[in-house]
């Protein structure tokens, strides 16, 4: 079972400064990496569309290994405060730069470059490796070494072939209802209006082979308010309250994400 999350663009509206928005997204990314989230869906909610593209860029930037960022991201204003971001330190990021330590079977992230008409892959070892895969120049790719040092030949693979958590995808959605109505799998809607979560509730999902989508509302609207009367058209969903008897008026997204995923993870 793979777990994905859906979070609203409006979750940044509580922060007025871009540096604070950047820090908040960093916490969200860390929470998703800790609990091995497969895909982060950023759905549009509210009127500030620029927050959506900003959130998406920072989430993708954080998930990208540090040694590839210079090739994949231009210097733009949205990355002005990248220095405050906390690194994810997931397995795809923790790779040695010494080519002599590479052995057959190692998996890495790289970016495709073209030199004199030939394609190479840069995997952060201060030398380019010839590449014969289909990924176009300028794009990120997952490779596996067929031969270690000194021959260093590689093949293109799907990142799902890694035996360890390799990172999350980030996808934008224009609205939440389209995501929920098209989702193939189980859905948990986090809500104060839901049933208080129990071990029995969660085991139905954690023991299932179906993928799970965990949905979070906005600072001003819960998921039921966002969806409105179309809620009954959402299949395989259940509303659960992960914070019963909360003392605070609201639970911020970063708090809800960490708390909810920790509870789900404990039942896996």
Locate each region found by the language model.
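Post-transcriptional modification and biogenesis factors for structured RNAs
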Residues: 1-268
């Amino acid at each position: 079972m793979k777990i994905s999350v859906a979070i609203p663009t409006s979750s940044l509206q509580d922060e007025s400064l871009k540096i604070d928005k950047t820090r908040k997204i960093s916490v969200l990314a860390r929470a998703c990496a800790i609990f091995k989230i497969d895909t982060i869906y950023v759905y549009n909610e509210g009127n500030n569309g620029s927050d959506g593209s900003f959130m998406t860029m920072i989430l993708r930037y954080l998930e990208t290994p540090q040694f590839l960022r210079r090739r994949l991201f231009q210097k733009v204003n949205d990355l002005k405060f990248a220095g405050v971001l906390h690194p994810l330190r997931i397995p795809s990021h923790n790779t040695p730069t010494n080519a002599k330590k590479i052995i057959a079977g190692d998996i890495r992230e790289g970016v495709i470059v073209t030199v004199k008409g030939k394609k190479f892959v840069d995997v952060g070892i201060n030398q380019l490796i010839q590449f014969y895969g289909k990924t176009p120049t300028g794009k990120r790719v997952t490779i596996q070494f067929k031969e270690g040092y000194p021959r260093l030949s590689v093949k293109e693979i799907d990142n799902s072939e890694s035996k360890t958590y390799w990172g999350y995808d980030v996808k934008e959605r224009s609205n939440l209802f389209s995501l929920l109505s098209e989702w193939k799998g189980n859905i948990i809607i986090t809500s104060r209006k839901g049933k208080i979560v129990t071990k029995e509730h969660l085991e139905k999902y954690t023991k299932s082979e179906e993928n799970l989508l965990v949905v979070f509302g906005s600072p001003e609207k819960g998921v039921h308010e966002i969806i409105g009367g179309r809620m009954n058209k959402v299949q395989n969903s259940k509303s659960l309250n992960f914070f019963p008897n909360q003392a605070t008026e609201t639970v911020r997204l970063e708090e809800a994400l960490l708390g909810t995923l920790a509870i789900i993870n404990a039942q896996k």
